[in-house]
C-alpha cells in the first residue's frame, strides 16, 4: 500500500489533503514537474510543489505519466485515473470506463482520498449508511452519481473531473461529450472498414503494453469475446489462452471450446459445483473478495470469482497474466422501440430510470428513487437532451439513443459491469480493454442509427470475420426463446402480451434458469431461505436483486461489508 500523507495529521491548513492509495500500479510523478496549460497555476515559493499520481491496470512505461498529462482527457488511451494536486487544489480525473474508482470525504479541514473503502473507513470522520443511496442500490446494484453507501463519502464518476478545493467545496463535471456524428456513416461496408481500423489500432497497442505476458481471454458463447479472439489471432498474439467456466455439460462451455479449437487457441474450463461454490463463498474468501471489489458504490461482480480463485490456487495460469475481456462499446442501447413513434421527453427519461431499477421486479421503483431520477436528468443535460417539458426532441431517434446509451454507460456499465475488472486485480492479475478504448468509441459514434441502435450489424460483422478466420459458421449461446425465428417470436410475444400471460411465462422461464444457472449463480443465493428466493423471484426479482438485498442486510458472506447503520 502507498500511504501518501501530504499534511501532518494535526495540520488544519486549508490546503491540506491526504492520499491513501492501495493499488500497486500507481505511478507517482516528480515534485515540481511542469503542469500542462489546463492545470492549476504553479505553486508559490512557500506552497508545496505539484504532485501527480497515475493509475493504470498494467505498470506504466517510463514517461507515461507526463505524456498522459499533456494529452486532453478525450485523447488519452487505455485505462487510467489521474490525480493532480497543485496550490491547494486537488483534481481527480477518471477515464470513460471508470476503470479505477476514487473515494473522497472531508475530515475537518483535510480532504481524505483513497481507492479502498476499508482504508477510507479508517480515516473518515464517520461511517454511516447513506439510506437514500442504499435504496437505489437495492433496485439497481449501484449508487448513482457521486453518491456512495456511506454518508458524506463520495466517488468519482466515469469520464469526469472532480475538483476538491481548500475551502472544503468541491465540484464534478463530465469531460466526455457523447455525441453521434452529425453526418454518420450509413454504408455497412464503409462502417466495417472504420471498425476494423479502430480494432487494429487498439489491439496492437494493447499487445505492446502487455509486452509478452500471458494473455487470458474469457471466451463465452457470445459475440464479443469471439471477435476479440479473432483479432488477437489476426495480429499474431503469442501465448494466448482462452477459458470458460460453468456447470459440467452446459452448452456455453461446449460452444466456447469449439470456438477456441476453430481458432487454434489453447483452452481450458473450470467446472462449477454450486454446492462447493456456495460453501467457499460463505467463508473468508468470499468476504475478502467483497471487500476488495465493491468500491463503496457497487455490488461485487461475482461471475468470475470462483474460476479466478481456482486459477490462482491451482496455478493454472501465469502469476502475471493479463486478462482481455470482451467488454465493448457496442450494445448499450435499450428500449429500442422509443426510436420510432416520436416519444415524449418524459417517456424517454422514464425509460432510462426504469431500465436501471428493475432488480426487485418493481417497474415503478424509479418513482421513489429521486437520486436515480436526478442522475438521469444530469445525463440528459450532458448530452443536450431537453430536460424542460414541452417541445419536440431535437434530432429525433438519435437524441433518444444518445441519452439512453450515455446514462447506461455512466451508471450501470461504469459501476457494475466494469467493476468486474476489480476481480482480476483482487487475485493479482492485470487487464486491458481494447474493445472499449478511445478508437473504438470514436468509430462507433460515426455509425448511423440503423447500424448502431441494435447489435444486428455487429453480429453480422462478427460472423463474417469469424468465418474469414476459421472457414466455419458461427454458433452462439442463446436462451431457448431466442432460438425461435424472429417473425414467429414477435407474434408469440404479442399474443402472450394481449392474453396477459407473457409476464408469467417469462418469469417462470427466468426462475428456472436462476435456480439452476449454467454458471451456478444459485450458489450466491444460498444465504437466503429457499422459500424466500421463490417468493421474491415470483414477484420479478432477479438473482442480482437477491444479492443486493443480502449485501445490504450484511448476510451475503461471513460478515457485513457495508455500513449497517
Feature-to-residue mapping (PLM):
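Short, glycine-/Ser/Thr-/acidic-enriched flexible segments
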Residues: 97, 118, 328-330, 441
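Adenosyl-5′-phosphate
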Residues: 4-16, 24, 318, 365-565
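Conserved adenosine/adenylate-binding substructure
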Residues: 77-80, 211-215, 282-337, 374-431
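ATP-dependent adenylate-handling ligase core
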Residues: 248-311, 327-357, 397-398, 445-449
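Cysteine-centered catalytic environments shared across enzyme families
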Residues: 1-219, 223-275, 542
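Glycine- and acidic
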Residues: 180-190, 215, 241-244, 289-295, ...
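Active-site cores of enzymes that catalyze phosphoryl transfer or operate on phosphate-rich substrates
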Residues: 159-162, 220, 346-369, 377-389
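Generic recognition of stable, solvent-exposed alpha-helical segments in well-folded globular domains
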Residues: 157, 190, 194-198, 223, ...
Amino acid at each position: 500500500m502507498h500511504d501518501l500523507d501530504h499534511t501532518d495529521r494535526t495540520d488544519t491548513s486549508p490546503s491540506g489533503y491526504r492520499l491513501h492509495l492501495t493499488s500497486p500500479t500507481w505511478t507517482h510523478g516528480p515534485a515540481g514537474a511542469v503542469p500542462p496549460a489546463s492545470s492549476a497555476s504553479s505553486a508559490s515559493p512557500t506552497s508545496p510543489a505539484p504532485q501527480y499520481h497515475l493509475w493504470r491496470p498494467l505498470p506504466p512505461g517510463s514517461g507515461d505519466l507526463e505524456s498522459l498529462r499533456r494529452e486532453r482527457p478525450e485523447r488519452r488511451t487505455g485505462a487510467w485515473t489521474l490525480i493532480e494536486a497543485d496550490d491547494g487544489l486537488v483534481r481527480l480525473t477518471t477515464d470513460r470506463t471508470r476503470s479505477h474508482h476514487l473515494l473522497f470525504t472531508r475530515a475537518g479541514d483535510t480532504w481524505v482520498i483513497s481507492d479502498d473503502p476499508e482504508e477510507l473507513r479508517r480515516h473518515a470522520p464517520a461511517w454511516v449508511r447513506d439510506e437514500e443511496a442504499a435504496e437505489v442500490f437495492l433496485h439497481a446494484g449501484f449508487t448513482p452519481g457521486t453518491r456512495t453507501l456511506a454518508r458524506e463519502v463520495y466517488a468519482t464518476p466515469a469520464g469526469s473531473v472532480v475538483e476538491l478545493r481548500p475551502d472544503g467545496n468541491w465540484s464534478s463535471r463530465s469531460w466526455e461529450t457523447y455525441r453521434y456524428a452529425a453526418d454518420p456513416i450509413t454504408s455497412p461496408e464503409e462502417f466495417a472498414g472504420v471498425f476494423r481500423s479502430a480494432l487494429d489500432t487498439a489491439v496492437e497497442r494493447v499487445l505492446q503494453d502487455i509486452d509478452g505476458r500471458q494473455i487470458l481471454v474469457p471466451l463465452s458463447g457470445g459475440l464479443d469475446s469471439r471477435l476479440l479472439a479473432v483479432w488477437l489471432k489476426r495480429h499474431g498474439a503469442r501465448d494466448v489462452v482462452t477459458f470458460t467456466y460453468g456447470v459440467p455439460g452446459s452448452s456455453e462451455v461446449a460452444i466456447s471450446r469449439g470456438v477456441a479449437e476453430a481458432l487454434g487457441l489453447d483452452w481450458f474450463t473450470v467446472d462449477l459445483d454450486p454446492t462447493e461454490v456456495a460453501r467457499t463463498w460463505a467463508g473468508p474468501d468470499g468476504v475478502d473478495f467483497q471487500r476488495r471489489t465493491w468500491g463503496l458504490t457497487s455490488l461485487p461482480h461475482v461471475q468470475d470469482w470462483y474460476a479466478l480463485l481456482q486459477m490462482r490456487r491451482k496455478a493454472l495460469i501465469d502469476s502475471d497474466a493479463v486478462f482481455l475481456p470482451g467488454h465493448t462499446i457496442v450494445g448499450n442501447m435499450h428500449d429500442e422501440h422509443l426510436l420510432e413513434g416520436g416519444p415524449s421527453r418524459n417517456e424517454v427519461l422514464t425509460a432510462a430510470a426504469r431500465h436501471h431499477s428493475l432488480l426487485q421486479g418493481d417497474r415503478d421503483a424509479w418513482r421513489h428513487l429521486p437520486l436515480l431520477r436526478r442522475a438521469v436528468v444530469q445525463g440528459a443535460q450532458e448530452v443536450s437532451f431537453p430536460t424542460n417539458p414541452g417541445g419536440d426532441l431535437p434530432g429525433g431517434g438519435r437524441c433518444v439513443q444518445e441519452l439512453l446509451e450515455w446514462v447506461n454507460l455512466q451508471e450501470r456499465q461504469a459501476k457494475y459491469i466494469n467493476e468486474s475488472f476489480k476481480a482480476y486485480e483482487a487475485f493479482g492479475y492485470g487487464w486491458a480493454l481494447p474493445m472499449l478504448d478511445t478508437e473504438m468509441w470514436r468509430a462507433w459514434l460515426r455509425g448511423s442509427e440503423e447500424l448502431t441502435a441494435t447489435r444486428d450489424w455487429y453480429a453480422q460483422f462478427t460472423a463474417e470475420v469469424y468465418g474469414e478466420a476459421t472457414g466455419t459458421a458461427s454458433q452462439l449461446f442463446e436462451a431457448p426463446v431466442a432460438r425461435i425465428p424472429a417473425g414467429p417470436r414477435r407474434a408469440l410475444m404479442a399474443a402472450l402480451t394481449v392474453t396477459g400471460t407473457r409476464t408469467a411465462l417469462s418469469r417462470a422461464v427466468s426462475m428456472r434458469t436462476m435456480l439452476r444457472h449454467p454458471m451456478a449463480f444459485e450458489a450466491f443465493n444460498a444465504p437466503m431461505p429457499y422459500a424466500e428466493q421463490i417468493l421474491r423471484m415470483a414477484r420479478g426479482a432477479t438473482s442480482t436483486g437477491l444479492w443486493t438485498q443480502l449485501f445490504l442486510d450484511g448476510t451475503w458472506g461471513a460478515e457485513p461489508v457495508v455500513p449497517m447503520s
